[in-house]
Swiss-Prot record:
Keywords from the named record: Cytoplasm, Isomerase, Porphyrin biosynthesis, Pyridoxal phosphate
GO process terms (BP): protoporphyrinogen IX biosynthetic process
The UniProt record lists the keyword Nucleotidyltransferase: no
SUPFAM superfamilies in UniProt: PLP-dependent transferases (SSF53383)
Organism listed in the record: Geobacter metallireducens (strain ATCC 53774 / DSM 7210 / GS-15)
Localization per Swiss-Prot or TrEMBL: Cytoplasm
EC numbers for this chain: 5.4.3.8
The organism's taxonomic lineage, starting at the top: Bacteria, Pseudomonadati, Thermodesulfobacteriota, Desulfuromonadia, Geobacterales
Protein name, as recorded: Glutamate-1-semialdehyde 2,1-aminomutase
N6-(pyridoxal phosphate)lysine PTM positions: 267
Keyword Magnesium belongs to the record: no
Subunit and interaction comment: Homodimer.
GO MF entries: glutamate-1-semialdehyde 2,1-aminomutase activity; pyridoxal phosphate binding; transaminase activity
Reaction(s) this enzyme catalyzes, per UniProt: (S)-4-amino-5-oxopentanoate = 5-aminolevulinate
Membrane-crossing segments per the record: none
Length: 427
């Protein structure tokens, strides 16, 4: 496969953009390759600068549940552009999308629009702190909630130990307010609560961990978090930036029947444009400025083009049978890849929830970050490069989720499974 123009672009980009990319994982560094530069996309297919076509299972890291360039999304945004691209003022479109989100997501009674998932999570945490009057938060190892300082923190040694920065530039004094528990382990949460009684403002969790591969919650885990938070007066935040409108129309909280106090959203609600949102109980959300004292603002929050794309996307997701069809496509792909690995004699551990799935390069069960980190990342990197040569575009990391869209055809899925079998055989 010729990728000479992508190589030229990457060399040029590295001279003017740090690392040559505007988000680190795009550099393909962890898979020992150089990125292909994408120039256009349609349906399930993306096309690079050298005119190579790939079946895409990244989907812009989750937003493209309808596939690329859905004609109704394109048409609606084109019409909206004719009325102006940004006003910095309230619009009726904001109300329309907010009403749709409130109707869809069980925990959300009021919602505030922002421009990214990181904005959503950092604002939700600030609001939880303001509402409770407490400073500390609990997050989980392996869960990613954006690049805000309080969230770039890893666990210290022992339950009572404060978190330590996971990136240069995060002050140690700031990181001490973030406590880290083990995903799918209620006992680790209870130990932190016991050590920091009445200090914890919120617990933030991906209800389905999607940033260490795809790791579903074990039975009772989310229920246990709900009970702990209720008993301790702690705000439970579900980070559904990835799972919202993805694993069900009402997100993971609808799928599992567990209602948090607050929810963060992003990706799908923007229809491919930059949108985030956070919402929850009315009594909490009313503490936001200008109705309350907790400050949050944004120049492009509620951008009319993004609101338009979001509204049209949610309308399409409401069509009869949408999630049933998506579930079948996803099941066929995930089971097909797992079967291809078995036939090739290569061991993997496969997980899937709805249209999110992951093939972990390990023999053992993956249920938290420690078990995910046991994967053979070198073999995954080889597999990734081989699949790319076969025209299959996967996330360039063992610890990312693959996404299926409604645009993926049975032919796409069959081709992907056949390519996977061939690539597993080479390992």
């Amino acid at each position: 496969m010729n990728t000479s123009h992508s190589k030229e672009l990457f060399a040029k980009a590295q001279e003017i953009i740090p690392g040559g990319v505007n988000s680190p994982v795009r550099a393909f560094k962890s898979v020992g390759a150089e990125p292909v530069f994408i120039k256009k996309a349609s349906g399930s297919t993306i096309i690079d600068a050298d005119d190579n076509a790939y079946i895409d299972y990244v989907g812009s890291w989750g937003p493209m549940i309808l596939g690329h360039c859905h004609p109704r999304i394109v048409a609606s945004v084109q019409r909206a552009t004719e009325n102006g691209s940004s006003f910095g003022a309230p619009t009726e479109l904001e109300i329309t999308l907010a009403e749709m989100v409130v109707a869809a997501v069980p925990s959300i009674e009021m919602v505030r629009m922002v421009s990214s998932g990181t904005e959503a999570t950092m604002s939700a945490i600030r609001l939880a702190r303001g509402y409770t009057g407490r400073d500390k938060i609990i997050k989980f190892s392996g869960c990613y909630h954006g690049h805000a300082d309080s969230l770039l923190v890893k666990a210290g040694s022992g339950a009572a130990t404060f978190g330590v920065p996971d990136s240069p530039g995060v002050p140690r004094d700031f990181a001490q307010h973030t406590l880290t528990a083990t995903f799918n382990d209620l006992e680790s949460v209870e130990e932190l609560i016991c050590a920091h009684s009445r200090e914890v403002a919120c617990i933030i969790v991906e209800p389905i961990a999607g940033n260490m591969g795809t790791v579903p919650p074990r039975a009772g885990f989310l229920e246990g978090l709900r009970e702990i938070c209720t008993n301790e007066g702690i705000i439970l935040i579900f980070d559904e930036v990835m799972t919202g409108f993805r694993v069900a129309y009402g997100g993971a909280q609808e799928r599992y029947g567990i209602t948090p106090d607050m929810t963060t959203l992003g990706k799908i609600i923007g229809g491919g444009l930059p949108v985030g949102a956070f919402g929850g109980k009315r009594e909490i959300m009313q503490q936001l400025s200008p109705s309350g004292g907790v400050y949050q603002a944004g120049t492009l929050s509620g951008n009319p083009l993004a609101m338009t794309a979001g509204i049209e996307t949610l309308k399409l997701l409401q069509e009869d049978g949408f999630y049933g069809r998506l579930e079948e496509k996803s099941r066929a792909l995930a089971e097909g890849i797992a079967d291809a690995a078995r036939r090739a004699g290569y061991p993997i551990y496969s997980t899937r929830v709805g249209s999110m799935f992951c093939a972990f390069f390990t023999n053992g069960e993956v249920h938290d970050w420690t078990s995910a980190a046991m994967c053979d990342t070198k073999s995954f990197a080889t597999f990734f490069r081989s699949m790319l040569e076969e025209g299959i575009y996967l996330a360039p990391s063992q610890f990312e989720t693959a996404f299926v869209s409604i645009a993926h055809s049975s032919e796409d899925i069959e081709k992907t499974i056949a390519a996977a079998f061939s690539c597993f055989k080479k390992l």
